[in-house]
């Protein structure tokens, strides 16, 4: 039930996400084995990068106290994909709803 409510809330707030300082986002993980090694910005994938469709490239986001930079795009609207080097770490992370702070 909580997950469904968060999904509805995020769907309603997604158009305004670029103007928010804090939001709750569905987060998942990806590896170079999933999508290749080059990001949408032309960089080589690296730890500290995230894929996100609703924030501009270069935006710094903080998730669980760790800073990440948006440097890629993902196939799921409203989701933030965190790059991880190992498949095992990505599987262990799974899909989670996280508080995300957008640094301006």
Question: Which residue ranges define each predicted feature?
Answer:
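Positively charged n-region of N-terminal signal peptides that target proteins for export
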Residues: 1-4
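Bacterial N-terminal signal peptides
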Residues: 7-15
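Solvent-exposed, well-ordered loop and adjacent helix/strand elements within mature globular domains
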Residues: 19-104
